[in-house]
């Protein structure tokens, strides 16, 4: 029996309209009744996630910013990881050959250089939004991550440019097909979950996890039971071909699987 369940948000626990379904909320409550520790592991900001948990009266640990921060049930900071200032400076000041928009995150929020209303559709559930600033005036010593949002082919070309410029000084990953992230070296959800399990006196074998994108790869590959969403990025399936694939987030597939796991743990599972 797993003792901790870790959930990605976008494309996993959230439906395509970026809301949590009623079945999902009911299933999360059932997990808590079984004393299973809930953990939300997401690229979203801790300020947004704390607001969501408060609105839903959910007790959960938070892995946010794709592993840059880990917070306890009470909001205590358990782990932090920031980009080195020289890496942040290079990414912010370099002229990249890309049409993608750039977004900077630190403990105060989400910052970008111009209005992009379409991006806010993913935040209708919480009302969280960016702040418009001159990105070249950002403090460089406390940047948690930098994201580029745009067309996937354009981002793939940008990934090559970033890798050539940064080498091994940063971790690059796609948190969605349209979002490329620049993270501290060694920073990912799996590493953050390792920190959390050590804090809780658990092992990764005691954990189950669900995800759909390449920023979930390390987490899914390290836990005792990892599950890939039916709507997952093809690259994730190719990287972890041994893991089971469940249904689509639009059908609240995590809830569907967990209901079966709670009620019929000894019977085979079918996502249909």
Swiss-Prot record:
Q: What class of enzyme is it?
A: hydrolase
Entry EC number(s): 3.6.1.-
Q: List the Gene Ontology MF annotations in alphabetical order.
A: 4-amino-5-hydroxymethyl-2-methylpyrimidine diphosphatase activity; magnesium ion binding; phosphatase activity
Write down the InterPro entries for this protein, in alphabetical order.
Cof, HAD-like_sf, HAD-SF_hydro_IIB, HAD_sf, HMP-PP_phosphatase
Cofactor(s) listed in the protein's UniProt record: Mg(2+)
Sorted alphabetically, the keyword list is:
Hydrolase, Magnesium, Metal-binding
Binding of Mg(2+), residues: 8, 10, 212
Asked whether the keyword Transmembrane is assigned, the reply is no
Residues forming the catalytic site: 8 (nucleophile)
Write down the superkingdom of origin. Bacteria
For this protein, what reaction is catalysed?
4-amino-2-methyl-5-(diphosphooxymethyl)pyrimidine + H2O = 4-amino-2-methyl-5-(phosphooxymethyl)pyrimidine + phosphate + H(+)
Q: What is the stated purpose of this protein?
A: Catalyzes the hydrolysis of 4-amino-2-methyl-5-hydroxymethylpyrimidine pyrophosphate (HMP-PP) to 4-amino-2-methyl-5-hydroxymethylpyrimidine phosphate (HMP-P).
Q: Which family does it belong to?
A: Belongs to the HAD-like hydrolase superfamily. Cof family.
Annotated protein name in UniProt? HMP-PP phosphatase
Per UniProt, what is the name of the gene that codes for the protein in this document? cof
């Amino acid at each position: 029996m797993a003792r901790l369940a870790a959930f990605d948000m976008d494309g996993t626990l959230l439906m395509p309209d970026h809301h949590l379904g009623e079945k999902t909320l009911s299933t999360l409550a059932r997990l808590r009744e079984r004393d299973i520790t809930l953990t939300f592991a997401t690229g979203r900001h801790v300020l947004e996630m704390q607001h969501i948990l408060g609105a839903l009266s959910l007790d959960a640990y938070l892995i946010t910013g794709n592993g840059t921060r880990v917070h306890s049930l009470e909001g205590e900071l358990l782990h932090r990881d920031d980009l080195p200032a020289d890496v942040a400076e290079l990414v912010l000041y370099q002229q990249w050959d890309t049409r993608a928009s750039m977004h900077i995150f630190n403990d105060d929020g989400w910052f970008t250089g111009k209005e992009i209303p379409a991006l806010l559709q993913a935040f209708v559930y919480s009302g969280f939004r960016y702040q418009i600033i001159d990105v070249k005036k950002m403090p460089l010593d406390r940047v948690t991550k930098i994201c580029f949002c745009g067309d996937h082919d354009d981002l793939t070309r940008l990934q090559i440019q970033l890798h050539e410029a940064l080498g091994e000084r940063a971790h690059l990953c796609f948190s969605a097909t349209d979002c490329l992230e620049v993270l501290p070296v060694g920073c990912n959800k799996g590493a953050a979950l390792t920190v959390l399990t050590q804090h809780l006196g658990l092992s990764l074998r005691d954990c189950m996890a669900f995800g759909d994108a390449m920023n979930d790869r390390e987490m899914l590959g390290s836990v005792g039971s990892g599950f890939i969403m039916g709507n997952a990025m093809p690259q994730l399936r190719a990287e972890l071909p041994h893991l089971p694939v469940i249904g689509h987030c639009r059908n609240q597939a995590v809830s569907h699987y967990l209901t079966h796991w709670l009620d019929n743990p000894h019977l085979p599972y079918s996502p249909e």
